[in-house]
């Protein structure tokens, strides 16, 4: 029997499909890994309490309002009623789905089904497949379909990043299907994606690229996921159309043009480039998979090895500073953003799966794992207040400074949304395998079944 080898590695859910080349490793479903007593289990349990403390009817209010239905409770405040209405609701679907997979908690499962049923009611009422909470959504998308596009970094036609906002709903529906097995979520996801095809089918490639100047999350990734879920190539074409060439083209050429850019606008785009490369592996009519995969790896290497600090985080005031000057990182009170590391870990998982150790051809590259471990332990785990479960937006590197944690009723930042997800899925990365070789990826007390 072959000796079991133990290396630091990381995992990715097998449900998200095959890599560009045959994956070096496979991954265990989240429900097969039970956390044992450790700070990670404590973080998971604390997050569970935080998740269930949120009022689903308040999170659903923006979606019902935009569908012309009467909300059952008022919206939350902060970012949830100032233009980004509904973004937490999408993250909430993902968090519930992964928490259910990790714990089997029936209260979580019931909460997820309630959210999905109410969102389905909103979707059916609108009648086009659309689901969203951005104020004035229906007119906004009518204008976009007509080619009336006014895009800036954080707005689209005067609205606060509506593409970014609906990406959270797309991702939440995907996760409800993949992690919790909801057929309803699958149906809603496909209908929602068909709606986007209808909205954008009349837009030229130039209009699409103009629209993508507005932050849009990882829509290209989720559309590639829909392509794999359904086996329908039209969704893969949509994913490619939602890939921002302003970022992609320099990366293909191995050019670092990131200085001054909003960091977490770019990272999800790159996740999408990698995902499209994976799903396109069997597409004989499209021969860019290798270069898109390479672009994602160049981006990762640039950010991890030239733009990150010891905790694995990056950015100052949400933007990439010059790679040869970290002065602002040491002086500013707004250091690395938690959302950035959330997305860098997602990218790292994907790249690791079909990587190659330069010193051992048949083994995956441990450099991806070294970063993953560093960022998970020092940034993600530390971003949660361990008793009450609040989440951190910025982790300052400024000596002697402090961090500010969210409050469940009043804080609805982006890093609250990603924070809800971060602590649900620790078990997904602990183990991996290939044939008769088991990789113990993270030294977290746990039981594999």
Where are these regions (language model features)?
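Bacterial Sec-dependent N-terminal signal peptides
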Residues: 1-21
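Glycan-recognition and catalytic cores of secretory/periplasmic carbohydrate-active enzymes
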Residues: 20-449
